[in-house]
Amino acid sequence: YKSMSNDLKKYIQLVYSNKLDSKMTSEAFDVIMSGNATDGQIGAFLIALQINGINKNHVLGALDIMQKKMIPVNVPKNSIDTCGTGGDGIGSLNVSTATAFVVAGSGIPIAKHGNKALTSKCGSADVLEALNIKLIADPIELEKCINEINICFMFAPFHHPAMKYVGKVRQEIGIRTIFNMLGPLLNPGKVNSQLVGVFSEEVQTIYGEVLMELNRNKSIIVSGGFGMDEININGENKILVPGSEIKKFTASSIGIKNQNEKDLDGGDAIYNANRIK
């Protein structure tokens, strides 16, 4: 039996009174990610943070600890990631995973970071398994993979073992938390460029600030119409390069015709895998 520390209690109080800064967020995440908080404390902390509003300091503070506990992979300097936040609840096809194959085929190394589904029927790891692609844990194998075929897939649980302390709580509370925002920022290849899909303009703005602080200013953050974390062919899209203003555009403004929304509907892993083929 391991006695649980009450260390997180003071940070729950700080979130509750809206006084949590970047340094305190790091300290709180250190407690959580070392296994020194109870599930009840973690749930209270995450929900209080969600209700009071997450800002860039919370994200940067959490990232600091998460990166220290991450198992990294050496990837080429010009690698990019196409990992979105997910959590849009729309259940579309795995667009960013399909995109990764196309971009890698065009000669740009893709260090793709992803996970199994939490809020949808099929996450990027689920669809890859349905395509008979083995999830590799060994960083040396992954490095070899990206150098040989221009793409590797880094399965989040292999690289972020400390996430085991929050997995159960996240599933039990079932709402979006700061962890949905952290995933795409925690690429084990420490890529400098990424195409990130987010589910709201508010999150898009925070990402812009965070990516500037991290010097990942060759990134593009997109949010689609109807709350999609992808560029949407039919709705209005918002696109942001860190350090600039959000720009709005529709696919029709660049000559792409509107499509039937239903064509993007996803299903289970087998269905999505067949659509990607």
Regions found by a protein language model. Name each.
Residues 81, 115-116, 187, 257:
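Conserved catalytic-core motifs characterized by acidic clusters
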Residues 6-10, 19, 68-71, 92, ...:
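Glycine-rich anion-binding loops and their surrounding alpha/beta cores
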Residues 4-92, 106, 110, 258-262, ...:
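Acidic, glycine/proline-rich low-complexity segments that act as flexible tails and inter-domain linkers
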Residues 27, 61, 65, 101, ...:
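Alpha-helical scaffolding segments of alpha/beta enzyme cores, especially the outer helices
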Residues 84, 88-145:
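A generic, well-ordered mixed alpha/beta core segment in the N-terminal half of proteins
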Residues 34, 52, 83-86, 113, ...:
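Short glycine-rich loop/turn motifs that provide flexible caps or phosphate-binding loops at active sites
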